[in-house]
Curated annotation (Swiss-Prot):
Annotated domain remarks: The N-terminal domain (residues 1-60) is important for binding to the unfolded mature imported proteins. Residues (47-69) of the cytoplasmic domain interacts with TOMM20 while the C-terminal segment (residues 61-80) binds presequence of preproteins. Requires the transmembrane domain (TMD), a short segment (the import sequence) in the cytoplasmic domain localizing separately from the TMD and the C-tail signal in the C-terminal domain for efficient targeting and integration into the TOM complex.
GO molecular function terms noted in the UniProt entry: mitochondrion targeting sequence binding
Assembly with partners or alone: Forms part of the preprotein translocase complex of the outer mitochondrial membrane (TOM complex) which consists of at least 7 different proteins (TOMM5, TOMM6, TOMM7, TOMM20, TOMM22, TOMM40 and TOMM70). Interacts with PPP2R2B and TOMM40.
Species this chain originates from: Bos taurus (Bovine)
The protein's name: Mitochondrial import receptor subunit TOM22 homolog
GO cellular component, as recorded: mitochondrial outer membrane translocase complex
């Protein structure tokens, strides 16, 4: 204040240049003011942001969201039904065929092993006729 008394052309001190309103308040009061400003929730802030768009844009965005939600629900229901139909059809139509082929292969493997045991090890490889004599070793 002494500088103000010295005259209008006198240089000001650093204390006089700083703003006095916030400098006198303690930090706790400043934090409380910030907390008071942040009391609104995220949904309130988002709702407040919608007011900056015209009603026509908001209604179009809402209709688009509703339509996309409806389509997503329909696609989900359809995919569930299609998956159920595909899975049950596979189990009824394809699995019995797979099991029978596996059973047939196992029976053929057992017959081949029995033939090897009864007729010798080369019989299974040459695929000779049943009841025929085994081939002589060393001759093809």
């Amino acid at each position: 204040m002494a500088a103000a008394a010295a005259g209008p052309g006198a240089p000001l001190s650093a204390d006089e240049l700083l703003p006095k309103g916030d400098a006198e308040k303690p930090e706790e009061e400043l934090e409380e003011e910030d907390d008071e400003e942040l009391d609104e929730t995220l949904s309130e802030r988002l709702w407040g942001l919608t007011e900056m768009f015209p009603e026509r844009v908001r209604s179009a965005a809402g209709a688009t969201f509703d339509l996309s939600l409806f389509v997503a629900q329909k696609m989900y229901r359809f995919s569930r039904a299609a998956l159920w139909i595909g899975t049950t059809s596979f189990m009824i139509l394809v699995l019995p065929v797979v099991f029978e082929t596996e059973k047939l292969q196992m029976e053929q493997q057992q017959q081949l092993q029995q033939r090897q045991i009864l007729l010798g090890p080369n019989t299974g490889l040459s695929g000779g006729m049943p009841g025929a004599l085994p081939s002589l070793p060393g001759k093809i």
